[in-house]
Amino acid sequence: MIHAGNAITVQMLADGIAEFRFDLQGESVNKFNRATIEDFKAAIAAVKANNDIKGLVVTSGKSTFIVGADITEFGQNFAQGEKAIVDWLMPVHEIFNSFEDLDLPKVAAINGIALGGGFEMCLVCDYRVMSEAAQVGLPEIKLGIYPGFGGSVRLSRLIGIDNAVEWMAMATPKKPAAALKDGAVDAVVAADKLLDAATDLVKQAISGRLNWKAKRQEKLEAVKLNPLEQMMAFNTAKGAVLAKANPAQYPAPKLLLDSLQAGASLARDEALKAEAEGFAKAAVTPQAEALIGLFINDQVVKKASKQHEKGAHPVNQAAVLGAGIMGGGIAYQAASKGTPIIMKDIGNPQLALGMKEANNLLTKQVERKKMKPAQMGETLARIRPTLSYEEFKEVDIVIEAVTENPKVKEIVLAETEKNVRENTIIASNTSTISITRLAKALQRPENFVGMHFFNPVHMMPLVEVIRGEKTSEEAIATTVVLAQKMGKTPIVVNDCPGFLVNRVLFPYFGAFDLLVKDGADFQQIDNVMSKFGWPMGPAYLIDVVGIDTGVHGAEVMAEGFPDRMKPDYKGAIEAMYEAKRLGQKNDVGFYKYELDKKGKKAKTVDPTAYEVIAPFVTGEKREFDNQEIIDRMMLALCNETARCLEDNIVATASEADMAMIMGIGFPPFRGGPCRYIDQTGVAEYVALCDKYAHLGKAYEAPQMLRDMAANNKKFYG
């Protein structure tokens, strides 16, 4: 054994070829944490000291290659400021450079995922061979940063500026065919041929059949474009990238382009310094903190879901009650992920609607070449429409998705319970009605759980799994595991009106109503909140949700939280409802909707909307300060999020933030309501609440936040 470290071993194979093997002990994956980087340095020294080694094959002892840097170490490194980040990176560059500069050929045998720092490791090798099962890429932009271990410098020299920008800015892992086509890897082979293929390349390089020194030299020099070609390449790249990523919201792509441009005319070592300086600028942004936090929060949510796996019972057959758009969407989602599902309704027209919805969604998959026609047929065969309960004795879980009316739901749930086995779980897809309340209609409330899908089901990743007062842990566990099997991200919450997401969303709509009442133009509110980062403003959002749905939901919320969700005035949303303006459902709401050239509903300004709300505006019509609009909208939403934590509706800030991002489109680069409070500063946030407390209870800082401010605490760190 030439080197035996905690993360890397080096041992001789044959013919002067050694295996440089990454296998981080005590971990399921390889990653570049501090320990691995130190061991990397030691392993390089061991190779340098051994005169028998003529070439290296770089391998992994895990099912993945190297998944990247250790993101949990970023917070500590990034908190030190730009200079300290550069001072941290440059010694890492020296280690990677010393490996690249070894006077012998090196081939990476990429057996699985090689992302971020993992692929940057591959780039310091002279050749790269990829298994058919592997994926490679530099997705750091998703974290609000960009490649920091030399990836931007080496990839741009290897595959050209245009391709490199696309790889890094789009942040999409590349499959073997795409990586080979772009020239990022040199060969793709079957998994069982990987080591042989990599070893053969090393042999060819040692024998002189491959000019590995010339291939390496390309990465050590400036980009092979003259100044005019460089300017054209970067102008094209900037146009494409900045059209998709607003630098005010996502600064990393622009910083990446600036760094690439600064380093394009420089040799490797100077270009790496430019990369490090740009990386440091990105790393200290609040967006990087939020997006890295989001990645870590996603791991927290996945870990919480995994803990339910042991307590779940298998779901071999599911059923959905109600064959509307929602029921059809649920049936499609279950069937497309392999779970057979019975779809029941009270009439053939309703069943036809549900099957049409599933059929339309599957047809789109086929048209986009994401599914073969035969697979579509197999998926449709997993959905069995029925008018009776005859087959319900074989069902493991029933998802009720009938109209959002407590009396209707109670009747349907009680009837269903009589037609299923004693251990069958019944889940309600209610969006606001208390699970504990609905459970009173049942004989076996322990088998009853909330399973709240968001609309449209096939697109929205979140499922709220709601624990009622008497819901068993088995019911929770089974529902969580089914949601995961359906390709969704489940978050378990405790019962209350609106659960988590809608409980937080309705004060946001309430803040909108109050702003309009006070004289704000709803279009200004929409524009301000869109620029803030929401996918759409609140007026447009309520039009999309359905104004009737919003009004009915608001009634449930007002009953549950009268102190802050029951206004003593009639708002603009209710005015629209009374005027039978329901939003996109009937093409008139706050906006008017007409089909565009693509057949999608496009919004236009409708003067009638202003006439409808005019009688309910009591304030002087004026242009509000943008920051006041942001503060009033965000305080109402963030306060209710904090109250949900205070009331133990949701277990952690991580889950609360993820739910808001996945459920209502909270701007990801702001990290969620809890991260937003942290970044505002908890004491400063509480002071803002005090400033607007005269507007009502929704604006009063929850005691939890006052305590945190007094003790200098944050949600994160």
UniProtKB/Swiss-Prot annotation:
Region described as 3-hydroxyacyl-CoA dehydrogenase: spans on this chain: 313-717
Cross-referenced InterPro entries: 3-OHacyl-CoA_DH_CS, 3-OHacyl-CoA_DH_NAD-bd, 3HC_DH_C, 6-PGluconate_DH-like_C_sf, ClpP/crotonase-like_dom_sf, Enoyl-CoA_hyd/isom_CS, Enoyl-CoA_hydra/iso, FA_oxidation_alpha_subunit
GO (cellular component) term, any one: fatty acid beta-oxidation multienzyme complex
Known EC number: 4.2.1.17, 5.1.2.3, 5.3.3.8, 1.1.1.35
Region feature Enoyl-CoA hydratase/isomerase, mapped onto this chain: 1-190
Domain of life from the UniProt record: Bacteria
Keywords from the UniProt entry: Fatty acid metabolism, Isomerase, Lipid degradation, Lipid metabolism, Lyase, Multifunctional enzyme, NAD, Oxidoreductase
Binding-site residues for NAD(+), renumbered to this chain: 326, 345, 402-404, 409, 431, 455
Subunit structure: Heterotetramer of two alpha chains (FadB) and two beta chains (FadA).
Role according to the record: Involved in the aerobic and anaerobic degradation of long-chain fatty acids via beta-oxidation cycle. Catalyzes the formation of 3-oxoacyl-CoA from enoyl-CoA via L-3-hydroxyacyl-CoA. It can also use D-3-hydroxyacyl-CoA and cis-3-enoyl-CoA as substrate.
Name this protein carries in UniProt: Fatty acid oxidation complex subunit alpha
Source species: Acinetobacter baumannii (strain SDF)
